[in-house]
From Swiss-Prot:
Keywords: Glycosyltransferase, Lipopolysaccharide biosynthesis, Transferase
Enzyme class: transferase
PANTHER family referenced in this protein's UniProt entry, alphabetically: GLYCOSYLTRANSFERASE (PTHR22916), UDP-GLCNAC:BETAGAL BETA-1,3-N-ACETYLGLUCOSAMINYLTRANSFERASE-LIKE PROTEIN 1 (PTHR22916:SF3)
Superkingdom field: Bacteria
UniProt-listed Enzyme Commission number(s): 2.4.1.60
Family stated for the protein in its record: Belongs to the glycosyltransferase 2 family.
Disulfide bond positions: none
Pathway the protein acts in: Bacterial outer membrane biogenesis; LPS O-antigen biosynthesis
Keyword check for Glycosyltransferase: yes
Protein name: Abequosyltransferase RfbV
Amino acid sequence: MLISFCIPTYNRKEYLEELLNSINNQEKFNLDIEICISDNASTDGTEEMIDVWRNNYNFPIIYRRNSVNLGPDRNFLASVSLANGDYCWIFGSDDALAKDSLAILQTYLDSQADIYLCDRKETGCDLVEIRNPHRSWLRTDDELYVFNNNLDREIYLSRCLSIGGVFSYLSSLIVKKERWDAIDFDASYIGTSYPHVFIMMSVFNTPGCLLHYISKPLVICRGDNDSFEKKGKARRILIDFIAYLKLANDFYSKNISLKRAFENVLLKERPWLYTTLAMACYGNSDEKRDLSEFYAKLGCNKNMINTVLRFGKLAYAVKNITVLKNFTKRIIK
């Protein structure tokens, strides 16, 4: 069986090399692997580094450098288009593979699931400081889910602890290539930062879809390096609302119960009080208004949200107080 590591990258030469090292250092597995890298016109010597790796290591590297920067969303998709494998393990170029992850994955592959979803370990930016040894996406142990009907999906959604359970985190996703290729992509998801989630949710909603949850941290997530924060902490919060409310409407507008179950996963990721306090600290007037509207769509009390937001100046003044700092740190990560 061939596993394709599908890695979108842009100017992350050093991090990418750490990822390749973590793959090369895997032991005790009996799988064929290939590395598929879509480089978004990097200028940091990534291409030269790849040439060195090709000469020094046994696994094949399929590398394509885009002539222009396509933007992150199109590059996510481009990395998968390079793959020849039975399964694609979609991987952020700043993350790393945990020890023995391929050997562990191999023990699950007999289920022939359409999707494998694994947990992650969270570290500092150096991949050394352990901040959370096991971040779980579901409140269950290992489980094989079969989605024959909407009740099956609703039960699954009720067990999600965050939007990681509905495919937000790239490096946790291992998907059958033929299932991915069968989806007719909706180009309106370009620019949402979550184009892959549209495809994964389309697979998830396919009758008979098999999802195998691996309650083990096979991935090391590099902290303090969220590319979604480039436009600020407040915008980072709104990205989740914009994409996941769109997903809720596009997939479940005709099933109120399932739509609510999906939206509740977003509320677990972005609990209203913590998130509103963070927005009060970091958001401008437009961003605060948008957050208030989003929570109203989720059934939250708009007056309560706006009351908390009005304390923005006070919240900003005391944001270094331990309690509030912990609140905002929980949301902005």
